[in-house]
Structures are given as C-alpha cells and as structure tokens.
Amino acid sequence: TEYADLAETGDWQQHFIEADVVVMLQAQIGGNNYQEFVRNNIDSTRNILNTVKDQNIPNLVHISSSVVESVSNDYYTNTKKEQEDMVLKSGISAPILRPTLMFGWFDRKHLGWLSRFMKKVPVFPIPGDGKYMRQPLYSADFCDIIISCIENNIQSGRYNISGHENIDYIDMIREIKKAINSKTLIVRIPYQLFYFLLWIWAFFDKNPPFTTQQLKALTASDEFEVIDWPNIFDVEYTSFSEAIDTTFNDPVYSKVILDF
C-alpha cells in the first residue's frame, strides 16, 4: 500500500509500469469544499489517464457513478459527469461501471455511518416522510462485477449497475435498525428543519458525514435503469436483506470500523 495524492504526479506512477490492468476507483464523495472535488475527481483522473497512456496499459476499468444520469446539481454529480466524459474522450478502451448507492463491510460513510450513529442516539431523525426511493447495491456484488471485467477482458460499454430492489430510505433505516438490534426511535422531522440542522452542523465540522447537497440528492427522486448485470457479468445477486445481515452481523468483518 502506498499513500499518495493522485492529483499530483509523483512516485505512485511507478506502480503502473508493466501493469496489465488499472481499476480507477478514486473519488471525492462528500464535503463542502468544491476544490476537493476538482482535485480528487478531475485532476487525479487526468493524471491517471495520462499515466495509463504513457505506460501503454492495455486494460482500464473505470468506476463512474449512477449520478451521471441524476437530476441532481451538486459538486459530486457535476465532477463525476466531467470525470466520465474525460474517460470517454481519452481514447482508452474501458468498461464504465455506474453503481448506485453502495453498502457493505468497511463502510465509513453511507449506511455504515448511519448504523453507528443509530447506536449512539436515542432518536434517529428522518427528513420529511422518508419515502425517497433508493436502489442500494451490495459492495461485494460490485466487486464481483469488477473481477468479471478483468477476467473476461471486457473492453468497453457503459453499464448502469443498480441494486435490483427499490426500497424507500425510511424502510432502509428500519432494516438497519433491525439488523443491529437498535432501540433508537425513528422520528420524522420537517425537511426544512433537517436541512437547517445540517447547515448548522457544517459550521462546526469541516468534513461533515452528511451535507445539505447530499440531502438534496437523497430527495431528488432519481430512478436509475436496472440491467441484467448478474447475467451480463456472470455474477450472483445478493438480496438486500441478506446483504444487510452480512454487512452488520458478520462475526469478523462487521466489527472493523475505519476512521472517518
């Protein structure tokens, strides 16, 4: 493992020498600083693509995001759209995978953070009525798709990798509560109040786990294309309930918590 800032050229590029494949996963997901999104989603991508070309690496797998087809207008969505466009214009053959909201082991954000927050508070707030449809994707299934792209030498195509079960946000929270045996009370609060509380939080936390932009994205009512990716990539689909149970109750890996 080497820690490096991919937005800057450096010693990390030596690891590309004689590489057979590059899986491009890096991304700035949350935060309130636009320049962090530019550096980690745009500048880093430019450096990686240039290095792939310089080393004549034959295979690239690009991890994009379902948000490139979202109605949202925020830092993450806009820079991920630009990132995907950079890959398409690079001339490098690569399958482009667009996962929806992911969850699984070692999740320091998203459902992982929500589960830990739920364990700490007596009341868990839900914005509005909580009926915001999600299409959560189990990260282990997505890993199998990436492996399939590498092993089967998939060279091109844009694939919308959506979870196959539509589930409202509030029901997703209830499933997490059930999986971790939480006693917290789930309470709906007005959207504007929830937004205001996040806005206040951002004044005291430079890297908040959930931002007002992410709240807008949550309530954007996006519904992404569902393709038959289990057959396309010859992988198995894990049901949401089974995946949630494995995520939070595995005797070994569910206890591993990464620093936020």
Where are these regions (language model features)?
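Conserved catalytic-site region of short-chain dehydrogenase/reductase
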Residues: G31, S66-N78, M102-R108
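NAD(P)H-binding glycine-rich loop region in Rossmannoid oxidoreductase-like domains
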Residues: A4-N47, T51-I57, S66-S70
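Conserved loop-to-helix N-cap of the C-terminal "lid" that shapes the substrate pocket in Rossmann-like
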Residues: I96, W105, G130, Q135-C143, ...
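Conserved beta-loop-beta element that borders a ligand/cofactor-binding pocket
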Residues: D85-W105, S115
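A conserved pocket-lining segment of Rossmann-fold NAD(P)-dependent short-chain dehydrogenase/reductase
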Residues: R116-L137, I145-N153, N160-S162
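Mid/C-terminal beta-alpha module of Rossmann-like enzyme folds, strongest
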Residues: C149-F210, F224-V226, I232-F260
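Active-site beta-alpha turn of Rossmann-fold NAD(P)-dependent dehydrogenases/reductases
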Residues: Q26, V61-S65, R98-T100, S162
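Conserved catalytic Lys-bearing alpha helix of Rossmann-like short-chain dehydrogenase/reductases
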Residues: I42-I48, T79-V87
